[in-house]
Regions:
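Residues marking the start of alpha-helices
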Residues: 1-2, 30, 69
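Short amphipathic alpha-helical interaction segments
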Residues: 33-49, 54
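Short, Lys/Arg-rich nucleic-acid/phosphate-binding segment
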Residues: 56-68
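Short, amphipathic alpha-helical interaction segments positioned at domain boundaries
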Residues: 68-88
Length: 88
């Protein structure tokens, strides 16, 4: 089990993505009320840590690609992410 600490922006995006279905970047931006640059930067940090995956797969998502890309939580870290959100 991994001890995950999330920043406020990261926790907001993890809650918005949820644990069931992938969510499009445009929906994430609308739901979180964050700037597109902030959403993209935060998603890239979560993706580099392996906590979030993009569909289609990207190592790093660009600002122009973010709204039309789907994002989902990595199922291998789902339990750890739930605990990280619970501790907040």
């Amino acid at each position: 089990m991994r001890n995950i600490k999330l920043s406020g922006r990261e926790a907001t995006l993890v809650r918005a993505i949820g644990f069931t279905e992938p969510m499009m970047g445009a929906e994430l931006q609308d739901q979180t009320h964050m700037d597109s640059e902030d959403v993209t930067d935060t998603l890239n940090s979560l993706m580099s840590a392996g906590l979030v995956e993009s569909v289609p797969y990207y190592d790093e998502v660009q600002l122009a690609e973010m709204p039309v890309t789907a994002f989902e939580l990595n199922p291998a870290y789902a339990q750890d992410l739930r605990q990280a959100l619970y501790r907040r």
